[in-house]
């Protein structure tokens, strides 16, 4: 009785008539929310275009109307901003919610698990495919296992429970072969009762979308295991999905910038090296930037940083992948054999402005961040400044507060790799598939392609698309 009332309430907040899949999901959601079992978890999986976002938007709206508490979380600032947009409620990063910075500590661990003081609260996590359970920054956050810490945090609260949402066709976290947060067996390992539903029906509003038509083909190939052959992409009959050759590229990117803005346009490439080539080309030939760094430049953080926003309530660390905009360049200089710049920047996903020191050397490296040998060189050269400090612990304390050692590592952010784009969405995406041989095909490539396709909301441009990928090309 109450169950059907709740289902009806959520349905009324739907922007259109729900699909059969969504009706099933609504019933499961209602059962889950009304269940007496506090140790239950709902896994809501859905492919692009199947209406996960509409479903959750309607759920959040209904929870608010019924004065029930919900908290929205996502793995990155960019993903949290996208989530906030479609759910109509502020979303936070997982790190922001479940960790607290240690106030006075010389330990290497900077953040420890926070206490969950919420009661009777539903936690909804979007883009769960990105949640790792092996920390690259394992000494910094809690146990270093994000999924473990998230589950522990939620279920330590009084009558709190968790919905994990994600797309199993997307890339798993870096260095992992699958997304642990979307694996029901992994989740049952926490002694939770796991219910799951997978949305597969593409909603009617998306039927004319070439992006979703072709993303669905890739998803079907992943489900059927037919990933050792070139994917056949349909280009005819769609206005949002098309080829662009090298001669047209500059003009097309330029018109996307003029029409929708630089912040709504992204080039996705297969390697950091290609991304660097694109970034330089865009700065020189479209933005006409002659200086290495100029006001207005968009930069992407290349490595987590815990120094420049420490203690800031909105943003207590700067995450790898965040995009910042340069407001003004105060000075550039050389020191310790490296080049630095003092700049004022805006964090676009937090509406926050601050002054930082950035490392210019990483702008042109083919590596994702400063390579280890150069990191070591920077560390030991700066360490010499503290020769007068008698103890090793004292030296390390000085290094922890040294602005040059804690410099922000950045890359230009006009073109990025697919892993860096994950969790974000842009109106225009230019995708450079680059040179592909049959040996390079397989599940990883299909996931990469699917993830790249689904970053675009309005238009996807396939740059120099190899003809083997076209539906009507001979195989």
Each model region followed by its residue ranges:
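Conserved pre-motif I regulatory segment
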Residues: 2-40
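Conserved helicase motor core of P-loop NTPases
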Residues: 5, 29, 37, 154-160, ...
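Conserved SAM-binding loop
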Residues: 18, 72, 267
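Short, conserved phosphate/pyrophosphate- and ester-handling motifs at nucleotide-, phospho-/glycolipid
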Residues: 22, 76, 271, 423
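Generic structural signal for buried aliphatic residues
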Residues: 25, 299, 324, 426-429
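ASCE P-loop NTPase helicase motor core
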Residues: 26-27, 31, 36, 41-45, ...
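Short coil/loop residues immediately preceding or within conserved phosphate-binding loops
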Residues: 39, 321, 413
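C-terminal accessory regions
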Residues: 335-475
